Regions:
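N-terminal carbohydrate-binding accessory modules
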Residues: 28-81
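Aromatic-lined substrate-binding rim segments of carbohydrate-active enzymes
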Residues: 69-142, 256-269
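Polysaccharide-binding and catalytic clefts of secreted carbohydrate-active enzymes
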Residues: 144-312
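Bacterial N-terminal signal peptides
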Residues: 11-22
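Aromatic- and carboxylate-lined catalytic core of secreted/periplasmic carbohydrate-active enzymes
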Residues: 364-502
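Catalytic-core region of carbohydrate-active enzymes that cleave or remodel glycosidic bonds
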Residues: 261-271, 308-407
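C-terminal beta-sandwich/jelly-roll accessory domains of carbohydrate-active enzymes
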Residues: 457-470, 485-557
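Short, acidic/polar
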Residues: 63-76, 301-315
């Protein structure tokens, strides 16, 4: 049985084609450039003129060399990614000032094409994890031309000052050279779809630069444009932001302005969407480093952490997305932190999140609740041997499932009719309420491996066995395709159906149950054309540990 993609998907494709045609005549002859499209207040990422969800895998920080990437590709493919996230190092492409070498850059890009993967490219310039480690040696060694941040005691630290025009111009020159080369070698293929500018930028070791020049700026007035954008009263940084946030806000303004200038210059050459990621800090973060979580101490000062988002949006308009890296956060913290990045002015993209089982749950949750344009896991190439590390297997299973249903998922995101139910530490299930049906998702008992069968669910919640630990692998997506039709997919759960309260109906019945996938946007049954009509009574669907995808039709009576 076949079905065509929904009307919303067609509208998005049409809109993207119109917009891509207007970017510039220079791009009219090949594939349209990847871009973000906002329709009815919701963002969709368009690749080759079609809606796309990034299923990302990021390699380790020092893996972006041709020989190391050769070892990474099998693990990335085993994880079912459709996009690889890898860095480009300033100190590798410009070892000598003004002399650029893109030979490794080209080799890795060709490898990605050979793997049929898209690329999210990360610029490791002046800032990487609150330090300057990937800047060229000629920058690091010339402390006069490229001044370092001074801490409160006047001691220089391992961070370049965001107030240095010389540093900004050098960083920008290298980034523009890279974007110019990228346009030359990738304009026809459009392998690269998204740019990250710097990496977890900020100052680690000091809340701000205490050099005389920077201190003079700090004691002066807040720029009028920022005051107006944030709807505050004029004054010094302390007067406007208060003593607790003044220094971090000061650093955030100058750092965001620095990075925005680089992003803007790159877009003038090749207008790919850009994002900035952050080492999240402050309230609701899980402390993995046994330290006070303060700006400049527990996390780099000045980055787009959640309490600096308004400032960054005001001072960095050429950055399309601000994202939090939450790869070491438990699921409860993931939800609290990332909810703050879901804003009308900010598409949701999580580039570094899925290193554990928590990431697999977080992915389904983000698809439905935010809704995410993409998701990524850091360090996919890690571990010994050639096999994918065990902690990535569950997210890889999620990716496999979403790859098989992506057209429907995107359409459901756009319509707001996609919901998620994911297991937490003590939660045994979740109620999902749609217009005509009330669904109860019950999480099945915990297997330790995707190869083990789950414990059968009780026949009725009213006669359930005593509480057991919920399966950490239990996660479900449910989408309402029509008034009486649902897409159900997930792992280790059972889904029960009843009519909604007040509907005038007391029971539900399946008319048709199909297992299947989407191929080129068209639903295809995988159970050899058979449908299950009398096999699910009362109406309940069980999802296996290996994962199940169903499309069901019901009636109420």
């Amino acid at each position: 049985m076949t079905r065509k993609p929904g009307l919303l998907a067609h509208k998005l494709i049409l809109l993207a084609l119109v917009l891509s045609a207007s970017v510039t005549l220079a791009y009219a002859q090949g594939k349209p450039i990847a871009q973000l499209v906002k329709t009815d207040g919701k963002f969709t990422f368009m690749v080759d003129g079609k809606p796309f969800i990034i299923l990302g895998g990021q390699v380790n920080n020092d893996s972006a060399f041709p020989d190391r990437m050769e070892r990474a590709w099998p693990k990335l493919k085993a994880m079912n990614v459709n996009a690889v996230e890898y860095p480009v190092y300033w100190n590798e492409i410009e070892r000598e000032e003004g002399k650029f070498d893109f030979s490794d850059f080209d080799k890795i890009l060709q490898q990605a094409r050979a793997q049929n993967l898209r690329v999210v490219m990360l610029w490791f310039g002046a800032y990487k994890n609150g330090a300057m480690d990937w800047a060229p040696n000629w920058v690091k060694s010339d402390v006069t031309r490229f001044p370092r941040v001074l801490d409160s005691g006047g001691k220089p630290i391992r961070v370049l000052s965001p107030h240095s025009r010389t540093t900004l111009e050098a960083d920008k020159k290298a980034y523009v050279a890279m974007m110019t080369h990228l346009r030359q070698v990738d304009e026809a293929d459009r392998t690269v779809i998204l740019m990250q500018v710097e990496n977890e930028s900020g100052l680690l070791g000091s809340i701000r630069d205490y050099s005389p020049e920077s201190t003079k700026l700090f004691n002066g007035p807040v720029p009028a444009s920022l005051v107006a954008a944030l709807k505050k009263q004029p004054g010094t940084w302390t007067e406007v932001f208060g003593s607790r946030l003044a220094e971090e806000s000061f650093t955030a303004y100058y750092l965001s302005s620095y990075i925005n200038e680089i992003a803007r210059a790159g877009k003038q050459i090749y207008p790919l969407a850009t994002y900035v990621n952050t080492w999240e800090g402050g309230e609701d973060t899980a402390d993995a480093f046994d330290s006070f979580d303060r700006a400049g101490e527990g996390y780099p000062s000045g980055g787009p952490v959640s309490h600096m988002l308004d400032l960054w949006k005001a001072s960095a308009p050429d950055i399309d997305i601000l994202s939090a890296d939450t790869s070491v956060q438990p699921f409860v913290n993931f939800r609290m932190i990332n909810a703050r990045y879901v804003r009308p002015d900010n598409p949701y993209w999580s580039p570094e999140a899925g290193r554990t089982m928590s990431g697999a749950r977080a992915f389904f949750y983000a698809l439905a609740e935010y809704p995410a344009i993409g998701f990524g896991a850091y360090g996919v190439d890690g571990g010994s041997g050639s096999e994918l590390a065990a902690n990535y297997v569950d997210l890889g299973a999620d990716y496999r499932m979403v790859n098989a249903t992506m057209p429907a998922i995107i359409d459901l995101q756009a319509s707001g009719k996609l919901k998620a139910a994911v297991a937490d530490d003590v939660i045994r299930g979740k109620n999902l309420i749609f217009d005509r049906y009330h669904l109860l998702v019950r999480f099945l008992a915990a297997p330790n491996s995707l190869t083990q069968p789950p414990t059968p669910a009780p026949q009725s919640p009213a006669f359930a066995s005593p509480p057991q630990a919920p399966a950490p692998a239990a996660r479900v997506l449910v989408g309402e395709l029509g008034p009486d039709e649902f897409l159900i997919m997930g792992f280790n759960a059972a889904v029960d159906f009843r009519p909604t309260v007040g509907s005038g109906f007391t029971a539900a019945q399946f008319l048709q149950v199909e297992e299947g996938v989407y191929e080129n946007g068209v639903w295809k049954t995988t159970n050899v054309g058979r449908t299950y009509q009398g096999s699910f009574t009362p109406p309940s669907i069980s999802l296996t540990a290996q994962g199940s995808i169903y499309r069901v039709k019901l009636m109420r009576y």
